[in-house]
Amino acid sequence: MPVGLTGHREGLHPLHTYTRDEARAVIEIANRWREKLLNERGTRFVFPSDEFYLQAGMALPEDEEYEDYGQIDDGVGLLRALETEFHAAWAELPESERRSDGAKRTFICACGVSAAAFLAELFARHPLTGIEMRVIPVKNRFFGESVTVSGLITGGDLTDRLRDEDGEAVFITECMLRSEGDRFLDDMTLDEARRIIARPLIPVGRRGDDLLCALRGYAQGLCP
């Protein structure tokens, strides 16, 4: 996993984030070891984090390459699992719910900068009847803009970004919230954020089928 550097490093040892070429080099080294270990021990053992692939501009490994997703709590394989789960749930919908034409209601998916392009492509490949998804990347001014993961977005940064954006409801990953489930890392509560952006703000579980269920549930009036 690439080192995470905040904007609060004054007086600390100098470090730098990975460049595109450096991230590619890490993946190439990891792939050699993964192939060797799979042949010798039956497991790939080495699993570069999603951030390495995003930084390198390379496709994520296929679902089976993550084996049992043993490091998903640290975000390793999280995007591949999300896509696999979302696609499986979407494919089970009736064709009438998977159309891209007709009138649409606009919903926002707010996320960290690193995941934005991936999510935009996910929604583009999985149309939902009557729903247009806008993916809004949120820059992290609280910890520093080099911090690009969704789980470290604060309520202040989120509301500043969304205040003037069009969309009748906002969906976020529950990973943005503290363990209590109702408060961001900067102590802003969900209710405070909802009042600022003046629309529903809906936390969603990290699974892809959780996301699809939340979108359909809100669109069909099954959740507030």
Question: Over which residues does each language-model region extend?
Answer:
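Auxiliary Fe-S-binding modules of radical SAM enzymes
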Residues: M1-P224
